[in-house]
């Protein structure tokens, strides 16, 4: 039995924990260009509005920060051609320490717009930046309204309006 689904679930749970702890608006499995040939799905997308001095202004949404996370559990998953879609202002690959070391040691070309690689701590309690690739500023190419709408469409609410993260349930 492969450990891959279990590793993917544990990494996904850590991303959900991180997004919740950072008070982001977020959703898992966010689709862009749905029902089109170039349909792409991002594992997690988080949004934090810009609120200088804790004041919400009309520009808080457009100037806010979108963060995309792609979860990869093994080298086969990384090379599968699925995912590695980064549309955010910050974009992270989330993987095990072993996979991060393998990618770094084999001089794999990093995906365009990647900000860094996050890996779990030894006790799998949180994610830490293992490889920092933020040498230049990345700007999203999609408008905030489209990104927020994609997050809204991907939310999984129960009948009481409470968000249910489906990966944690499985």
Positions of predicted regions on the chain:
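Short, flexible loop/turn elements at secondary-structure junctions
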Residues: 30-32, 48, 72-75
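Non-catalytic C-terminal interaction segments of nucleic acid-processing enzymes
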Residues: 2-28, 32-39, 105-170
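Active-site beta-strand-loop-beta-strand hairpin of nuclease catalytic cores
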Residues: 39-68, 85-86
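Catalytic cores of nucleic-acid endonucleases
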Residues: 60-120
